[in-house]
């Protein structure tokens, strides 16, 4: 038999060339115990903190506790399919989510998977959920207004782009309503051909809420045409605690895409109390030592590292911004509990909502005395500064006098005038839901209030006066509104025109 060496080597070489099967090497461990959404695994010696791991059933988890002899893993989803003795493998990736404009108009879960039935997400970029906040040098101080469309907030507690403003109050005081109105108020900026700098993209993170509530919220956004520039991230009450814990970080990563690309975004965390509760549950099950109110020692760091990522970037970094509106729910107006005091100390001010005001019909139920913006008038336009400067002082005096006026009946004329003005200004700051006002319209309304044009009207007619003034301005004096909007200032000429319009409307109502 003739053995042809050249032929055999050619065949072998040919076969080796076509051999493309590469062995996949992955580090695996073994599940020691599982329960309550927490698994402990042996092995996984080189796993990183915060790394995504995968169980046999396809369920994913995140390694949080790296101990000497085992790894504590929180499970994203149900732990029913995970059994003791099963294998768990590293993925090598830290938890990340899809980001970009492809997410606009969508409802996703805490890991960025679509839950709205509209097909897969069109996104090419992914970002880690937990990254370091920008340093001191790339930032710039907050100087542009982030209009909420609510008179009580834009005039008295202005929020700027890049600010963190806390919305705090008991249940059912209208916290989500303020966030919703803020999102709806951004619609004019998103009209076709609008300036990218004027646009404000909105991200709403629902943490531990009822599914019906989230569905209702999404429906309002859809009906009002606001979903197209918004992203909704939902980790509802029935989702596992790790999903509720990670959702705000996932939302923040999506918001940072806009901030880092020279665009502007606002993110609402509704609410961080429930995130803290989910984190407490995870920490206690991982056997981390409890601290005050059984929260873990690093619950302050949990919220501070999240909220520090909201920032106004300097020109060198693209001049983008991410504004955060965290929501905290208090129990019986107790602002001195652990989580509320933590978040108040982290944020740049708070909007304090009160049940009593809400039931008195003052809506939005903002307690102007306890609410504050630590950015202040640098987040207002010149026009708003001119008219809103007075209103703060007058309302403060009114609150002080109203407390004394309960005791005495014989008040001198100046005190009576102050009380009259205060009650009318309070009435003026009321606003129905889903009716945000543009900056120039707010300026006109507040101008009428602080310059005494309402003092002669009965309090019951203040609402009618406001409606009449706005409809007159919109129909007959649109040029005046446009001029204030363009210059962002109330010039003497415009103030004169506005004065004559206000006087004629006051006459017709009075």
Swiss-Prot record:
Marked site positions, Required for activity: 371
Gene3D superfamilies named in the record: 2.40.30.20, ATP synthase alpha/beta chain, C-terminal domain, P-loop containing nucleotide triphosphate hydrolases
Keyword list, A-Z: ATP synthesis, ATP-binding, Cell inner membrane, Cell membrane, CF(1), Hydrogen ion transport, Ion transport, Membrane, Nucleotide-binding, Translocase, Transport
Record's bilayer topology term: Peripheral membrane protein
InterPro entries linked: ATP_synth_asu-like_sf, ATP_synth_asu_C, ATP_synth_asu_C_sf, ATP_synth_F1_a_nt-bd_dom, ATP_synth_F1_asu, ATPase_a/bsu_AS, ATPase_F1/V1/A1_a/bsu_N, ATPase_F1/V1/A1_a/bsu_N_sf
Major localization listed first in the record, in broad terms: membrane
Positions annotated to bind ATP: 169-176
Family annotation (Pfam families): ATP-synt_ab (PF00006), ATP-synt_ab_C (PF00306), ATP-synt_ab_N (PF02874)
Keyword Secreted recorded: no
Record has Transferase as a keyword: no
Known catalytic reactions: ATP + H2O + 4 H(+)(in) = ADP + phosphate + 5 H(+)(out)
Subcellular location: Cell inner membrane
EC number: 7.1.2.2
Superkingdom of the source species: Bacteria
Family: Belongs to the ATPase alpha/beta chains family.
Function: Produces ATP from ADP in the presence of a proton gradient across the membrane. The alpha chain is a regulatory subunit.
Protein name, UniProt field: ATP synthase subunit alpha
């Amino acid at each position: 038999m003739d053995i042809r060496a050249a032929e055999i080597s050619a065949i072998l070489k040919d076969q080796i060339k076509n051999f493309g099967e590469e062995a996949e090497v992955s580090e695996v461990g073994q599940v020691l115990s599982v329960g309550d959404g927490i698994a402990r695994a042996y092995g996984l010696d080189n796993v990183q903190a915060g790394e995504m791991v995968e169980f046999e059933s396809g369920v994913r988890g995140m390694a949080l506790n790296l101990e000497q002899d085992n790894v504590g893993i929180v499970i994203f989803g149900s732990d029913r399919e995970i059994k003791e003795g099963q294998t768990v493998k590293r993925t090598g990736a830290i938890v990340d989510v899809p980001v970009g404009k492809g997410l606009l108009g969508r409802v996703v879960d805490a890991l960025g998977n679509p839950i709205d039935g509209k097909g897969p997400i069109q996104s090419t970029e992914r970002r880690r959920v937990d990254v370091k906040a920008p340093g001191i040098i790339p930032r710039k101080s907050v100087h542009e207004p982030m209009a909420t469309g609510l008179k009580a907030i834009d005039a008295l507690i202005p929020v700027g782009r890049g600010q963190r403003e806390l919305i705090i109050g008991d249940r059912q005081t209208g916290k989500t309503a303020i966030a919703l109105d803020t999102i709806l108020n951004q619609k004019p900026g998103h009209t076709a051909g609008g300036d990218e700098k004027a646009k404000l993209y909105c991200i709403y993170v629902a943490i531990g809420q009822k599914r019906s509530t989230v569905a209702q919220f999404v429906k309002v956004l859809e009906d009002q045409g606001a979903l197209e520039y918004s992203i909704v991230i939902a980790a509802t009450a029935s989702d596992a605690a790790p999903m509720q814990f990670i959702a705000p970080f996932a939302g923040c990563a999506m918001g940072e895409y806009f901030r880092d690309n020279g665009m502007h975004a606002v993110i609402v965390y509704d609410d961080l109390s429930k995130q803290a509760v989910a984190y407490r549950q995870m920490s206690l099950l991982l056997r981390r030592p409890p601290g005050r109110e059984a929260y873990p020692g690093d619950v302050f760091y949990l919220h501070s590292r999240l909220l520090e990522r909201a920032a106004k970037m300097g020109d060198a970094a693209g001049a983008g911004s991410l504004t955060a509106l965290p929501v905290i729910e208090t129990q019986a107006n107790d602002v001195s509990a652990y989580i509320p005091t933590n978040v108040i100390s982290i944020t740049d001010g708070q909007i304090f909502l009160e049940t009593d005001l809400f039931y008195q019909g003052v809506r939005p139920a903002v307690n102007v005395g306890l609410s504050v913006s630590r950015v202040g008038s640098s987040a207002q336009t010149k026009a708003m500064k001119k008219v809103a400067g007075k209103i703060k002082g007058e309302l403060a005096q009114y609150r002080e006098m109203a407390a004394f006026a309960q005791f005495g009946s014989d008040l001198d004329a100046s005190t009576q005038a102050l009380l009259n003005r205060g009650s009318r200004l309070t009435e003026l700051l009321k606003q129905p839901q889903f009716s945000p006002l543009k900056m120039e319209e707010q300026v006109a309304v507040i101008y009428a209030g602080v310059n005494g044009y309402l003092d002669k009207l009965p309090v019951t007619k203040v609402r009618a006066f406001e409606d009449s003034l706005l409809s007159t301005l919109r129909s007959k004096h649109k040029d005046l509104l446009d001029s204030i909007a363009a210059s962002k200032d109330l010039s003497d000429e415009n103030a004169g025109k506005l004065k004559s319009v206000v006087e004629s409307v006051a006459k017709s109502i009075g």
